[in-house]
Amino acid sequence: MKFTFKIQQYQTEAVEAVVNVFRGQGMHANAAYLRDRGIENKPADSQLSLLEDEEVYADTGFKNENIQLTDEQLLMNIRKQQTVNNIKLSSALVKDLGRCSLDIEMETGTGKTYVYIKTMFELNKQYGWSKFIVVVPSIAIREGVKKTFEITAEHFMEHYGKRARFFVYNSSNLTQLDAFSSDGGINVMIINTQAFASSLKEDGKSKEARIIYSKRDEFGSRRPIDVIKANRPIIILDEPQKMGGDITQKALKNFDPLFALNYSATHAKQHNLVYVLDALDAYNKRLVKKIEVKGFEVKNLRG
């Protein structure tokens, strides 16, 4: 079955609010680096050959290019987007994860998963960034995100002429991390904190913690966390308020992210907010059938 997706203006605006923060970055090809393939057992009489030349080529990895903008330029771009979207201007750049942490506030049911997938494609088109990690708070949301990637694949192929390679992190299938590192296209790792939270703590006692932070014989005596962080991934947090707050934020620094995008209808912690589609906006645009008001608080308004 082929799904047809209508591009909504508010979704385009949400994408542009993020992409425009990096205006001035320019287009850069993925930064190539020498990928650690780990220890491999080679024949004792191994000599230089065409085969070994091919193996050297296979050692190449592709990571996200660094942000060329200064903190002052990033903050200026953020404030421009806040002005456009009638949001209270940020006084400082928030750098909880990487160079900046941006908040995108979207009411539940308005297609935020579609929005951040489209944002990946636009960031790749405009700036060349291609390595992403989507972090979700539950298995149910993880499966929903995976399904959205599946059903929108043809849609984005039609618009961008390429597909995103996506996979769910599985500590028993670490070879996926090698493909994530060596492929130059758009690559997305989806991971849920319910299955991974204990391993976010480097001194965790769980099986997952021992795997991600320890050198694995079956993984060429490498630590999976080192393979992941070498790519300088862009972190996308789906419903971050459900992920354990500061503990998760601190642990995610182990991924050495380029920057972070937070998508939620109710942000528990404020970063640099660049787009808002609240319940009233969603209702006025007929995106939801009704809203229930139990009290109100005025926030994010300029003036």
Question: Model-derived features: where do they sit?
Answer:
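RecA-like P-loop NTPase motor core of helicase/translocase proteins
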Residues: 1-303
